[in-house]
Swiss-Prot record:
Family annotation (PROSITE patterns): GUANYLATE_KINASE_1 (PS00856), GUANYLATE_KINASE_2 (PS50052)
Positions contributing to ATP binding: A22, P23, S24, G25, A26, G27, K28, S29
Official protein name in the record: Guanylate kinase
PANTHER family cross-referenced by the UniProt entry: GUANYLATE KINASE, GUANYLATE KINASE-RELATED
Family the entry assigns: Belongs to the guanylate kinase family.
Gene transcribed to yield this protein: gmk
SUPFAM superfamilies, sorted: P-loop containing nucleoside triphosphate hydrolases (SSF52540)
Amino acid sequence: MSETTHTAIDTAYPGNLFMVVAPSGAGKSTLVNALLAQDKAIRLSISHTTRSPRPGEQNGREYHFISVDEFRAARDRGEFLEWAEVHGNYYATSRVWIEEQMAQGTDVLLEIDWQGAQQVHKRFSNAVEIFILPPSLTALEERLKKRGQDEPNVIVRRLLAAGSEMSHASESDYVIINEVFDDALKQLQNVVHATRLRFSSQKARHAELFIELGIH
């Protein structure tokens, strides 16, 4: 992963920034989609990419599809929070969009890997990192097989990568073990709700009230 160097932002935006991290097969996307469907006060950050759209993909839904020249220009202007080159294509997270949303009081969620999460923390020190774990390695392997998306050799590589990825769970703020989906979803919702009640979040959202009450 790469980044444009920035100073960490400690500004208390009315909106919160959440990062959900997990190895492939842990159920991250399914949990995130369920959360977004039930909580309209949080928005998913859509990445920018230079790769071509796949069948069924729509610009602005799965990705923001842009040209290499557009990508490089935005990167050089410091508009990306973090970016990476994968298999000859560029991918990035928009810093500008995230700051705009949070300034308006909207919570933002990133589906991201642990390396990207480290870069985000350099820019947003108050970002909340949530790590999703499988109940066991056996369960993780079974889920990868049931998806039917990968060849056996790819599954082996994903399992090997998962071990390295999960070693970074200790860097997160919260850990959710996704054994029973409904329980995991409830726990994810609880993290979001609790974060909104933090002193810094409440002060940013209710600045005038806090001033009136003499709370600093």
